[in-house]
Amino acid sequence: MTDFLEFDAYIRQGEPNQQKRAAIWRTAIGLQAVDGLQTSDYLKETAKKHIEGEIDIDEARQLIKTYYQSKATRGVINDDQCEADKVSANITKILSSISLDFSAKGFVALHRRIFDGVLKHAGEIRRYDITKKEWVLDADTVNYLNWEDLYRALEFDIEQERNFSYKNLSLEQQVVHIAQFVSGLWQIHPFGEGNTRTTAVFTILYLRHIGFNVENDLFAKHSWYFRNALVRANYKNAVKGIDYSPMYLERFFRNLLLGEQWDLRNRYLHISPSAEWKEQPNLGEKQSNEPQNEPQNEPQKFTSLSTRQQQILSLLSKDNSLSKQRLADALGLSMSTVKRELSAMSHMVKYVGPTKGGHWEIN
């Protein structure tokens, strides 16, 4: 979260153009959290130059490109940070415009623009089936669409939405429909990587297009919740007694579009939450005088962690016997990345006992 808090001063005190540019950068940077990525200090300094009007967005993107070309030559490149920086700059350019190609072709082109210079197959439909282990599903996966039907499914969903009328619907009904559309679009998962970030940017552009004001921090601060809510909206397991659960995504959009205050912490979305995380509260409602089961605040040591470290801590808090390999599998990370993150968390997480049969202790 500290990645984009540095832009607060521009949003509070800056000129209108500075406020707008800072808000867009916050959203672009915040969206990297869906894959546990964090931007570099160089990206933040470059963003500030753009916010202050010293350079335009294309110059900012070129500076970042040149910066990583230099690092690659020296063999000191951080691939995750490189992706986060370049994608953040690309998203900032896209969100700085109001144009939207609301079509399957436009959705695919948007993926290409977001991941230009990052992914080898940017803007290409995947030609293989995929599964993804999700920590919110206890390492189970959503059933994504098979690869043969991807483009037709995109065309169908977007055409259906194009022909849908919001006339005579209440705002609450509109929110429910928007959540259904976005959930279905994401479930197609047409690309090998970058589906959630593409869906988020497409959603922001579309909501603007149909008249909603989405110039706030919700996507910036809660992009990981957004992804997990999409997962829960598309997951069903009859054996475990779990049905599709769109209400979490609807609550995200209720906060975004209706100004409600649902507590958007990810632990409420887990399919097997502890007792204190079973009921997601609306913080905007008046609290009764009766004792409350839900926690009011997470410990500071938890909220001060990076998104990736929060994911690791959340998994270990549910199962302290997880091996590093199982953590890596559940989060879709490499073993080296997991080891590096655990090392950075050594002041609060330690492994006790033999290599096999030991457990993690959280201070």
Enumerate the language-model features and the residues they cover.
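FIC/Doc superfamily catalytic core
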Residues: 1-363
